[in-house]
Amino acid sequence: MGAGKTTIGRQLAKSLTVPFYDSDKAIEESTGVDIPTIFEFEGEEGFRDREQKMIQQLTKLDGIVLATGGGVILREENRRLLKENGFIVYLQCSVDRILERTRRDTQRPLLKADNPKDRIEKLFAEREHLYLSCADFIVDTGIMQSKAVVNHILEEYKSANR
């Protein structure tokens, strides 16, 4: 959430000349409604069910870059599918930087809170250990420009696939 998954993912896919997929966008395209609407009518659990089905579909595709929503890591099946079918990059970013990047974004249901900073910190506390346990590579997107992040990922990916 706000770490740069879509921005970095698109640039990475372009550099690798492979298709880019965003699981949240794919869910919106398949349902015809946006993520906040899914949360409103189905709740987070309903959204997570849809997300898991989409991850099952997308991880069957070869030679793609996939950006997932930040909560995809919460379900064990998603973690298994991602680890078995890809090179996982954790785009790490500080709470303050994420808050700065998302403060005007109205399309993030989990940040609709009286105190968004507290909410982000709570999400980090719930998820960070899962991100770290799944990651093949970790890069801090809060301290580098996106092009430098992409180059760093490319170097690591190429060395891991020799």
Go through each PLM region and give its residues.
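Short amphipathic alpha-helical segments
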Residues: R10, E77-R80, E100-R104, N151-H152
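NTP-dependent small-molecule kinase module
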Residues: Q11, S15, L61, F87, ...
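ATP-dependent small-molecule kinase phosphotransfer cores
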Residues: D22-V72, E76-K83, R108-P109, E121, ...
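Short glycine-rich anion-binding loops that position phosphate/pyrophosphate groups of nucleotides
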Residues: G70-V72, S94-D96, M144
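Walker A/P-loop
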Residues: T6
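A glycine- and Lys/Arg-enriched "phosphate-lid" helix/loop adjacent to the NTP-binding pocket
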Residues: E84-E128
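Walker A (P-loop) phosphate-binding loop of P-loop NTPases
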Residues: G2
